[in-house]
């Protein structure tokens, strides 16, 4: 008379064969060769020429990867007369934050930070607006021109600033934005957050020097102008400015 099967044999999915197959340490080491995956992930030299010459839209025309990044972290004292900083200062080198040669393309600009007031200034009843201009200098020379030299204003008011007529072919305002802070004892807004991301595709050209300075630019320097509307109460801006750029293939 045959013995009766054990109770665990009648349970679905718990046979001895399946238990050995599932929990064996060698069960997960069997790899099946997938021809479709191998064809999709084939190396570049085995692809047609169109795949080797075509570049994705993420890479600007005439450039090559990888995407490099440079950060400018600084606290700015913004006054009524304005200030300027160059955000295309890239030193020549081999790192992920360096340019390979004379030419590169700034694909995008990311500005992150806040506008804030001093402890003594925020107690005064006033409203102060801080304005930013992202400007392209097509023919940089010497040192960056001051805010009052580039912009024409009515009654020295930065909110009415426009590029002077004789400099319109050299300076081009690519983007403009502002942030507002309010001081006072009751309805005060002592700080304002700043967050902007722009796609610019600005092709920068340097001379033979390696240092990342404005004076070494020959074409298309990126400048950030800042000014506040209040004449007597300055504000502070704690900003992290990141630019993402690609090296040119003609370097």
UniProtKB/Swiss-Prot annotation:
It comes from the Viruses. One of its GO terms (cellular component) is host cell nucleus. Homomultimer. Binds to single-stranded and double-stranded viral DNA. Interacts (via nuclear localization signals) with host importin alpha-1a. Belongs to the geminiviridae capsid protein family. Disulfide bonds: none annotated. Keywords: Capsid protein, DNA-binding, Host nucleus, Host-virus interaction, Metal-binding, T=1 icosahedral capsid protein, Viral penetration into host nucleus, Virion, Virus entry into host cell, Zinc, Zinc-finger. The keyword Zinc-finger applies. InterPro entries: Gem_coat_AR1, GV_A/BR1_coat, Viral_coat. It is found in: Virion; Host nucleus. Coiled coil: none annotated. A motif (Bipartite nuclear localization signal) lies at residues 3-20, 195-242. Encapsidates the viral DNA into characteristic twinned ('geminate') particles. Binds the genomic viral ssDNA and shuttles it into and out of the cell nucleus. The CP of bipartite geminiviruses is not required for cell-to-cell or systemic movement. This is Capsid protein. A motif (Nuclear localization signal) lies at residues 35-49. GO terms for molecular function: DNA binding; structural molecule activity; zinc ion binding.
